[in-house]
Structures are given as structure tokens and as C-alpha cells.
Curated annotation (Swiss-Prot):
It comes from Caldanaerobacter subterraneus subsp. tengcongensis (strain DSM 15242 / JCM 11007 / NBRC 100824 / MB4) (Thermoanaerobacter tengcongensis). The gene is aroK. Catalyzes the specific phosphorylation of the 3-hydroxyl group of shikimic acid using ATP as a cosubstrate. The lineage of its organism: Bacteria, Bacillati, Bacillota, Clostridia, Thermoanaerobacterales. This is Shikimate kinase. One of its GO terms (biological process) is aromatic amino acid family biosynthetic process. Binds 1 Mg(2+) ion per subunit. Substrate binds at residues 33, 57, 79, 136.
């Protein structure tokens, strides 16, 4: 079976929804950021701090290659995976790519519960979210299906992901 690839900006629920979908479909779950952390032996925030974004993106590309070779997985990608077109090519080979998107204020509310968001360690995080969303918008167009999660529960999003996957997996 093809993989389900969840992509989108940080704080859109990729990991939470991905785990729920994986459980429902009896798939395995993998998070590319967690794979990067395992490869580096440190957190994403530490990688950014000690080695910079470019080094992180190299590790991320290796994680994407590894994850894309799997079968029957729900793959939650890091928010910036889309910035490298070769990542999309890899993930599409054996996956249906579903974009989870949300309004900036929803993203800010969701990520304010967590720390270790190196790209948002700025004075005005909502403004930075808007800038990054605008910058990434062209890259998000590659998705096979898009879900606006802003006003939906985790369960509703998971159900929509499953419906989209069933519809698109045979193409």
C-alpha cells in the first residue's frame, strides 16, 4: 500500500493526526523530524543552534529518502520539507501527499503550547508565521489534497485524510 504523507506548516497537527490515522488504518507512523533527531543525536532546535538550517535540511533530505522507501506508513514531514523539490519527488513515488493548513492565529495558538520552534524564536511570531506561509505557498501547491484544519477536530481531520487517501491511492 502507498504511504500517506502529511505535510504543512508547523502546528497544523501533522503528528497528532498522523498517529490517529495510522492507528485507524493499522499503518506504522514515522515523523521525519524525529528521524532527523535520531540521526543527529540531538533535537531539531539543537541542530539549528549548533549547525544551522542548511545542515538540518541535509539531514532532513536523508530522512525523507529513508521514509519514502517504507510501505504502509503515515509519514509526518517537517514543516520545511516542501522547500526542497527533490523531497516531494521522493515522497510522491510511494505516497499520497496531503497538505494540512491552518490560519496563522490557529498555528500560533497550537505552537504556543510547545517550545523548540527555532524558526519562530522572534519578537513577533505571528508576523513570522505569515511571512513563512507566504514564502512556502508556491511549494504547497504540489499536494494531492489539501485540508484546512483551522475549524476541525483532530478526529474530523483524520477522517478526511482517510477518505482522501482511499480516493487517491490508486492513481
Amino acid at each position: 500500500m502507498k504511504n500517506i504523507v502529511l505535510t504543512g506548516f508547523m502546528g497544523t497537527g501533522k503528528t497528532t493526526v498522523g498517529k490517529k490515522v495510522a492507528t485507524t488504518l493499522h499503518f506504522n507512523f514515522i515523523d521525519t523530524d524525529k528521524l532527523v533527531e535520531k540521526m543527529a543525536g540531538m533535537s531539531v532546535a539543537e541542530i539549528f543552534e549548533k549547525h544551522g538550517e542548511e545542515y538540518f535540511r541535509k539531514l532532513e533530505k536523508a530522512a525523507v529518502i529513508k521514509a519514502s522507501r517504507l510501505k504502509n506508513h503515515v509519514i509526518a514531514t517537517g514543516g520545511g520539507v516542501v522547500l526542497n523539490p527533490s523531497n516531494i519527488v521522493q515522497l510522491r513515488k510511494n505516497g499520497v501527499i496531503i497538505l494540512l493548513k491552518a490560519r496563522p492565529e490557529v498555528i500560533l495558538r497550537n505552537i504556543s503550547k510547545t517550545k523548540d520552534r527555532p524558526l519562530l524564536a522572534v519578537e513577533d511570531p505571528e508576523k513570522r508565521i505569515r511571512e513563512l506561509l507566504e514564502e512556502r505557498e508556491p511549494f504547497y501547491r504540489f499536494a494531492d489534497y489539501t485540508i484546512d484544519v483551522s475549524d476541525k477536530t483532530i478526529e474530523e481531520v483524520a477522517e478526511e485524510v482517510i477518505r482522501a487517501y482511499i480516493k487517491l491511492k490508486g492513481r
